[in-house]
């Protein structure tokens, strides 16, 4: 489910955001009005989506994080194809990994999911 189409571009954007978190955001007071913070929102989207489409969602999020917005809880969303039960069972037995994200369906169609970090 991880975005593997453009790993180089994702790695560059991820490194920039992690640098911002470590060197700039660490020395300022917490002022993000949302949960997850805008930088975590960006990292989660870059993990699951194409970097170019993720940048559009990230830009909208950053523009909405201003003093005139009430903020709140706003998890990122992504569109994914649901794997078949047989395929997911085979993958589960072969390479079990630690669960890091929950994908919670937003609608009954199960095409759009909220990304929630465990």
Swiss-Prot record:
Disulfide bridges in this chain: none
InterPro entries from the UniProt entry: Membr_insert_effic_factor_YidD (IPR002696)
Membrane topology: Peripheral membrane protein
Subcellular location: Cell inner membrane
Keywords, ordered alphabetically: Cell inner membrane, Cell membrane, Membrane
GO (cellular component) term, any one: plasma membrane
Pfam families assigned: YidD
SMART domains on file: Haemolytic (SM01234)
Superkingdom of the source species: Bacteria
Function: Could be involved in insertion of integral membrane proteins into the membrane.
PANTHER family: MEMBRANE PROTEIN INSERTION EFFICIENCY FACTOR-RELATED (PTHR33383:SF1)
Family assignment from sequence similarity: Belongs to the UPF0161 family.
NCBIfam families xrefs: membrane protein insertion efficiency factor YidD (TIGR00278)
Name used for this protein in its record: Putative membrane protein insertion efficiency factor
Organism: Helicobacter pylori (strain Shi470)
